[in-house]
């Protein structure tokens, strides 16, 4: 057995959305007890541990999975890249994400988002920002993509573009998709970004 029954997947995903990670892990572990090499279950463990910020445990799970698949599974490579990002290992993360991106023909906005961030923080700022823009074109309703674009525009001192993205967020916040963070998180952060931009403009006027 390689897969998880659909009804159990729905239950696990619902528990993850409710942040009931321990309950989700219990269900996944019951599957792994019967089938220790169940690839979907191993991926679920990696994802849940990542959401719990248990990076080491998530790393072990995804390494085991990738070894089983000879490092040829885009989802496993994406998760491995994500975990390396959390450790600020931009070079290694970039390697895994690039392979995942190539295997999915650059069609997955989340892989593009993460790869773009890796390139940016590795020092290839223009290239990284370009991939974030591509991610936004593919899915303009992902709150994290919008948030990252605002961040990078501010870092690049492109305040007009940052403000445009802030306006976009405020206009579309009720229809945006949120995964690991809730709306309040983004509203608080983006409000601070907006105040920063206004302060910069005021400072420039006074100069």
Which residue stretches match the model-derived regions?
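Terminal, low-structured helical/coil segments at or just beyond the last alpha-helical repeat
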Residues: 1-5, 163-207
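Short coil turns that delineate tetratricopeptide repeat
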Residues: 36, 70-71, 105-106, 140, ...
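Alpha-solenoid helical repeat scaffolds
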Residues: 40-44, 74-79, 109-114, 144-148, ...
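Hydrophobic/aromatic packing residues within the alpha-helices of TPR/SEL1-like helical repeat arrays
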Residues: 28, 62-65, 97, 132, ...
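Register position in tetratricopeptide repeats
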Residues: 17-18, 51-54, 86, 121, ...
């Amino acid at each position: 057995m390689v897969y998880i029954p659909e009804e159990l997947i729905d239950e696990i995903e619902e528990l993850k959305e409710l942040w009931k990670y321990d309950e989700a892990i219990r269900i996944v572990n019951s599957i792994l007890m019967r089938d220790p090499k169940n690839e979907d279950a191993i991926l679920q463990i990696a994802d849940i541990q990542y959401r719990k910020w248990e990076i080491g445990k998530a790393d072990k799970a995804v390494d085991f999975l990738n070894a089983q698949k000879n490092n040829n599974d885009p989802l496993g490579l994406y998760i491995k890249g994500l975990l390396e990002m959390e450790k600020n290992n931009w070079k290694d993360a970039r390697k895994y994400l690039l392979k995942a991106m190539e295997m999915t023909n650059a069609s997955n906005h989340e892989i593009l988002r993460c790869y773009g961030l890796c390139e940016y923080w590795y020092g290839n700022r223009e290239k990284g920002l370009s991939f974030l823009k591509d991610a936004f074109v593919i899915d303009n309703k992902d709150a994290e993509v919008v948030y990252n674009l605002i961040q990078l525009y501010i870092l690049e001192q492109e305040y007009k573009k940052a403000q445009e993205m802030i306006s976009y967020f405020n206009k579309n916040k009720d229809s945006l998709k949120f995964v690991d963070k809730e709306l309040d998180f983004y509203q608080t952060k983006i409000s601070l970004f907006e105040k920063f931009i206004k302060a910069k403009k005021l400072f420039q006027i006074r100069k």
